[in-house]
Regions:
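Composition-driven recognition of low-complexity segments enriched
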Residues: 1-180
Length: 180
């Protein structure tokens, strides 16, 4: 549990804060009283905590990262939230560059733009954006819970913030992130 929290802090600038405080024993940690041996194999509870962590960390950091100047961003220094997949080749190239950066930054995986994992991640992003655009009644602002900057909901007219949140959640659930 401590290693996961340190990794999140190193990558996102602050700890998630849930594993060490509320879920330490469930995530295989010890308390030096009733539990003195760490779990060596992943459990179902650990998998559930990993899903919660990926969703929550992504929720807290994607919109906030886009609110910064590009030079200060950890996650998205090479793309803006209004860059939409399929709109033109330049847009797709920017998105692919951002995905390559995320793979390297979060997974320590150095892949080219034409790597199958990069393409899979691009398709995930493009599908989320396209599906949201097709559906009627989806708010053009980011969610209440995830999409606030200074207490105000952020506009997300192209659904790209939600798409990027999906991508970060997906990457945080990869074994390369969880079990390095």
């Amino acid at each position: 549990p401590e290693q996961l929290e340190r990794k999140i802090e190193a990558l996102f600038g602050k700890r998630w804060g849930q594993v060490e405080s509320k879920m330490k024993i469930l995530y295989g940690g010890i308390n030096s009283k009733s539990v003195t041996e760490r779990l060596t194999e992943p459990s179902g509870a650990m998998g559930a905590i990993q899903r919660i962590m990926a969703n929550d960390v992504s929720c807290r950091h994607v919109t906030a990262d886009f609110a910064l100047e590009p030079a200060k961003r950890r996650l998205f220094p090479h793309v803006e939230k209004d860059v939409v997949p399929g709109s033109d080749p330049t847009a797709d190239a920017k998105i692919l560059k951002a995905i390559v950066h995320l793979h390297e930054y979060l997974l320590d995986s150095r892949e080219n733009i034409d790597h199958p994992e990069v393409e899979r991640t691009f398709q995930l992003f493009a599908t989320v954006v396209a599906e949201a655009k097709k559906r009627k009644g989806i708010d053009k602002r980011d969610t209440y819970h995830c999409g606030r900057i200074d207490g105000k909901r952020v506009d997300d007219p192209h659904y790209t913030l939600r798409g990027w949140r999906t991508v970060v959640t997906y990457l945080l659930r990869q074994p390369e992130f969880l079990y390095e």
